[in-house]
């Protein structure tokens, strides 16, 4: 039977059902669009010789050099399951362009850890500052780097160029591992174990509590430890200067006998050992010993106030492979 309702509103029920379905579908679509609209990667063209500054209070930072002319940054939460907004801002300092990479302000809750993974051109300078807790890893750069984390480990490898590149590290509480550095190294730490190997320039490292171990260094070496040990292994150079000191702990230097040197060994409370017993060796007293080997050109100073001091002989082929 035809009624007024059926004549004026044919197919009314299917239309209502369709509208209801659309009503449920639209919010879901909008929600999905909002979720994937988060900036998960930033990219910016960078001039050669620019400086990249990284800020990330809580979380790890990983930086790798590439042959591209862009800086690219991705930020994720600790387990890597959720993208976090990241920004790259541009400024200048004198004639140098400065690009600052950081998670977007307000993109994290208090003390939430956010990890940054950044790719930069090889020929840039790098500076990581404002990192309170997190590890830093940097590799494959030709420019210098300046790194600091208040609590975390720092690892740097394959950094520098024939023109040189200073690697400067401050690590109040965390280990430091540097290798294949084509330039000078400066390290200041409070509680840290420091390992440095295969460096083309000078090495100067200081730690309050921990140990320092360096090997295969082409430049001068100065290691200073308040409480802990200091070790050097590798060839020395005729014009080289090597100074290892600790207040409380062991000092040891292991070198081939292929280069002449003059060594001053001292320990106020500890034993002195040497494999180099040349006719020119002198024993001033029980706490000091001077040794001249060969032409005496290199200069070695090993000192421990409370600990043993050793100067050991190794074969020339000993040591790590320092090819990059």
Can you say where each PLM-predicted feature lies in the sequence?
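Intrinsically disordered, low-complexity terminal regions
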Residues: 1-324
